[in-house]
Amino acid sequence: MHRHSVLRLARQAGGLPLVELPPPYLAPSLHFSLIRSPVQSSNFSSTTPVAGHGRDLSKSRGVSAIHRTGPKFKLGVSKYPLPKPVSPEALEKRNPTPDHGLWGFFPKDRQALSTPEYDHAHGRSWSIQELREKSWEDLHALWWVCVKERNRIATSNLERERLKAGYGEYESSERDRVIRVTQNGIKHVLRERWYAWEDAQKLYKDGYRPQDEE
């Protein structure tokens, strides 16, 4: 199709949309003249007033994880300088405390992982009848001995799992079971004493006096 024919057809139809115009290889001059503006919108110049880009509002300009480029200015993580590591030779020597209370959470050999022989060497649990004869101070002390021993067993179990030792699990679980039986007995005795105190308080409010029976 000739260019003049396309222009005449477009003027008669009041202007055809781009989808109805012929393809570029049939009318290249017409196609490019309709798409591109014949007038240049801005003057090209390499001088400083015209070629300046102005203020860059993008804060991430120049940051690329692929090319390992960072921002244009330094970023501080803190207003205080980072501490410098000290060599082990410059550190002050500390003498260990042989009788420190935290050693009670470890076996006698002071190792994080107890041996199966150590966990297996234990006695039976306290019976309820034996605990009934104990005072409040004795029960309180025995309870915290059980708590500390169970803490030590839990530490050994965690270390055994971390090292994947593959032994000592049965002995430690059996020792922990015996300790839990003792703790349940202590709670049972304290519960009995609480009920006895409530009953005695109720009888006293009702007017009962033991000396009146004599």
Swiss-Prot record:
The alphabetized UniProt keywords are: Mitochondrion, Ribonucleoprotein, Ribosomal protein, Transit peptide
What are the disulphide bonds in this sequence? none
Molecular function, one GO term: structural constituent of ribosome
Q: Domain of life here?
A: Eukaryota
Database matches in InterPro entries: MRP-L47_sf, Ribosomal_uL29_mit
Any one Gene Ontology cellular component term annotated for this protein: mitochondrial large ribosomal subunit
Q: Does the keyword Ribonucleoprotein apply?
A: yes
Its annotated compartments are: Mitochondrion
Task: Specify whether Metal-binding is a keyword of the entry.
Answer: no
Q: Which BP terms does GO give this entry?
A: mitochondrial translation
- Record text on subunit structure and interactions: Component of the mitochondrial large ribosomal subunit. Mature mitochondrial ribosomes consist of a small (37S) and a large (54S) subunit. The 37S subunit contains at least 33 different proteins and 1 molecule of RNA (15S). The 54S subunit contains at least 45 different proteins and 1 molecule of RNA (21S).
Family stated for the protein in its record: Belongs to the universal ribosomal protein uL29 family.
The protein's matches in PANTHER family, at most eight in alphabetical order, are given as: LARGE RIBOSOMAL SUBUNIT PROTEIN UL29M (PTHR21183:SF18), RIBOSOMAL PROTEIN L47, MITOCHONDRIAL-RELATED (PTHR21183)
Q: What is this protein called?
A: Large ribosomal subunit protein uL29m
* Biological source species: Aspergillus terreus (strain NIH 2624 / FGSC A1156)
What's the name of its gene?
A: mrpl4
